[in-house]
């Protein structure tokens, strides 16, 4: 055989080798470029944007946010201009770039360029917005229609992926009985508009039985919402005038104030599990008492405030863990296995005779709740809010996080100490698969659509990684055979 004929015979093989090498390179690049959690569950992270104004180490800017720990982030909050039936920024200097503002909207949505897995929504409402204006809006067909078009345009103008409705709550706090039905109309009309542009539609949902019964037609709103973010916290606080747990996982059978009751009740009312996102608090509720500082002790007035959040009756997890980390502070803590809650209390003040108490979720609480959410086949969990996690990593990590997991002998090693609660969520989500050892069911789509931008486009990310790995292996095996 001549040299020329030999080369011409090898040319197709050479081109095939080059093609396969290019394919292998692309596959490895896909693996390397993956961002976000290494599981297929939803982790929704609310950011309270006023946290930027907190003092010292409590100040939280968008630059502090770690997009790899969340699948969705919700920028909280925008407000309602009822005179225009329009969404509006509540802090133009912080949110917008106009008038030399800081451009918070653009900074948050800009994270998608380097983290393509991330979905960024804008929340409208919140506790301070109240309910009256939203009640007026949804009761009027003209106002409702104007709002639907304007909010769709606003969301797209600032490059958000969707809207989170945080009306607290329909029919409550100067709302009207008709709000329950009118809220369904609002979600339906937003769904129709948002489908034209591929936008997400979610809503924060109250967790108490009273609010659920009076405010929501659960089965109907589930048809139009991609996800229902259940606010499974604030079950108890200083407003009760006695010490209580902020977010107990379970409670006595006749007590509806628990996470388990809220989730089970919503499922009973027809909420699809693949649309339910269970809320986890990155904060505790505080109390002052003249008694001994135990559960159900009578409390005095509003709870004490922290140095960063500076809110009566409220303490961020970062404030709690720093307080408890001080060995000379005189604080003690006690774990309640029935509720997966921690109660911590100070020494008695010699002047006021009061004891300060805080009830909160530790890493162990979070892990147990994630396990519960996975056992119920929920879409995932959400957090309020990432800015009160120990985002700087100032505190020592808990050593009992997986104490209640049967198949975990040691906590996974972490590369970083920051965001201990958020990292626990992602660890526990993956560990729960082995703990429960039950195959995932296929969602029932007979009545509810596949969530937009959620289940359909995040189907088993772990399996995708395995497929990529197998693809790369196959390519290199073929390359090896051709080279022989």
Swiss-Prot record:
One GO cellular component term noted in the UniProt record for this chain: extracellular region
Modified residues (Phosphoserine): 467
Matches recorded under CDD domains: GH18_chitolectin_chitotriosidase
InterPro entries: Chitinase_II/V-like_cat, Chitinase_insertion_sf, Glyco_hydro18_cat, Glyco_hydro_18_chit_AS, Glycoside_hydrolase_SF, Glycosyl_Hydrlase_18
Listed EC numbers: 3.2.1.14
Catalysed reaction, written as an equation: Random endo-hydrolysis of N-acetyl-beta-D-glucosaminide (1->4)-beta-linkages in chitin and chitodextrins
GH18 domain mapped to chain residues: 41-432
Alphabetical keyword list: Carbohydrate metabolism, Chitin degradation, Disulfide bond, Glycosidase, Hydrolase, Phosphoprotein, Polysaccharide degradation, Signal
Organism the protein comes from: Drosophila melanogaster (Fruit fly)
Active site: 168 (proton donor)
Family: Belongs to the glycosyl hydrolase 18 family. Chitinase class II subfamily.
A GO MF label: endochitinase activity
Gene designation per UniProt: Cht2
Keyword Signal among UniProt keywords: yes
Residues at which chitin binds: 98-99, 125-128, 169, 231-234, 384
GO biological process: chitin catabolic process; chitin-based cuticle development; chitin-based embryonic cuticle biosynthetic process; ecdysis, chitin-based cuticle; larval chitin-based cuticle development; polysaccharide catabolic process; regulation of tube size, open tracheal system; wound healing
Signal peptide span: 1-33
Protein name: Probable chitinase 2
Disulfide feature: 45-70
